[in-house]
Structures are given as C-alpha cells and as structure tokens.
Amino acid sequence: MNEIAQHTVLISGGAGSMGQLVTDYINSRDDFTMTAIHDPNYEGQEYKTYKTLTNIDEDIVIEFSPSSVINENIELLLNSNANLIIGSSGVNSEMISKLKTKTDRKIIVIPNFSIGSAYQKLFSTTLSENFYSVNITEKHHSNKQDAPSGTAIDLANTLPSNINSHEKDGDFYQINNVNKKNIYSLRDDKFLAEQQVDFVNEYESFNLDHKVYDRKAYLYGIKVVLDLYSDLEGFNLGLENIIAKKINI
C-alpha cells in the first residue's frame, strides 16, 4: 500500500466555503486522498457521502461544520476509530475533556487555522508580562452574528486574569467582558476577519493587528498541520502550540 492510500480523508462540512477550499487543497497533495464528504448541502457525486458520522471507513476526519452542530458531531466521532482534525472555535470545554481521553489516536483541535492568528496569540502571551491593561477588538463580516468570536474568547481566557482592560471609544456591535478583558465586536461586510490586541502600561502602548483578506489564508495553517501530521501524537490543541517551537519567545 502506498503513502496516498494510508491517509484517506473525510471532510465534515465539505460543502461550506472552508470545506471546499480544503477539499481542493487536499487534492493538490500526494500524501492525502480525499474520499468522502459529510454535509447536508452536498449534492455532488464525486465523493462518497455520509448522512451521519457513523461507520466511518476513512483514516482522518477533518471537521469544518458550523459551531451550531460541531459538538454534536464530535460526540459521534468519539465513537469512531478515525483520527480527527477539528477546525472550529465552537468546541466546548466538556468536549475538549472528552477528546483528551482518546489517547489511542491523533486528535488535533485548531480553533483558528490562520498562521497570523497563531503568532498573535503567542506574542500576546509574552507581552502580557510587561503591560497591565489589554483589550481585544474583533471585526467580522455581517453574516457572523455571534459575538464575541471564538478566537477572541480563547485569547482572553489565555491571558492572565490579573490583567484588566481599558475603555475604548466607538460604536460597536457588542461589547463583552471575558476573564476581565474587554472584547469589542464589529460586524460589517468590509471585514472578513480581523483582530486587534491593544496593550497599555504607564509609559507606552503596543498593538498587535491581524487581518485576513481571503479565506485562503487558513490553508497555510492546514498545510502546517498536514506536513507535521506523521509527527503529531495524541491530543493537540491550538496551531500556536504546534508552531511555538519555531520561535524563541
């Protein structure tokens, strides 16, 4: 059996924008083979279709379903033998705990596949040692009604709880406070996905501004995970933890 046959892939949410991008990307590689899709909106015949996430034959399931169904899907996938790559910021803490117990296979949970977002989180963690105040502003397209974004919540919870927030002027879609951090949300079609982290101390400020202009930006993070797939073992959470060894901070 050759290397291609060793890595067959099912994409859950394969008819969505990211699912289609990832399908095309996997088809461009020699070491993974796209064989199946799970998505109620998929009407094609090129791939095997799964109505439910049961009796899975593929080696890997890449999960890109909406946050509204992601935890329900993972509950089903826990009963399979497939290795999992989960690309959602909507996985709840209970499901994370369950995933951690599956030590017999690869479980890779990546809330955000943007490499820029991963570096922003790493740098923010380091900056929090030298600044006493921080706030987060996240901007997304108008179709994203939930706020704050999962990426912003994840970052706020990662930063030390003893760092507070400063006020920010403006007309915002929502303002929330998570782990004592203010998160300011904007929704407008002039944005795809942006996040700014503003640090302040007594004498200076430092801003980390990250902007995604095209969903293809997420493919680089997927490339990183698939390139390192054979080396990753057990449970892995966050792209930043996978790439952290590349930089000394």
Language-model segments: what does each one mean?
Residues P40, S89-V91, N112-S114, K139-H141:
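Short, ordered loop/turn segments at secondary-structure junctions
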Residues L76-E94:
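ADP-ribose/adenylate-binding Rossmann-like module
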Residues N2-T52, S68, Y132-I249:
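C-terminal substrate-binding/catalytic lobe of Rossmann-fold NAD(P)-dependent oxidoreductases
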Residues N55-N71, N83:
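Rossmann-like NAD(P)-binding element
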Residues N83, K98-S114, F131-T137:
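Rossmann-fold dehydrogenase core element
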Residues S88-I107, I115-A118, F123-T126:
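Rossmann-fold NAD(P)-binding glycine/threonine-rich loop
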Residues F64-S65, G87, N201:
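Short, well-ordered coil/turn residues at beta-beta hairpins
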Residues N71-E75, S97:
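Alpha-helical segments flanking ligand/cofactor-binding loops in enzyme cores
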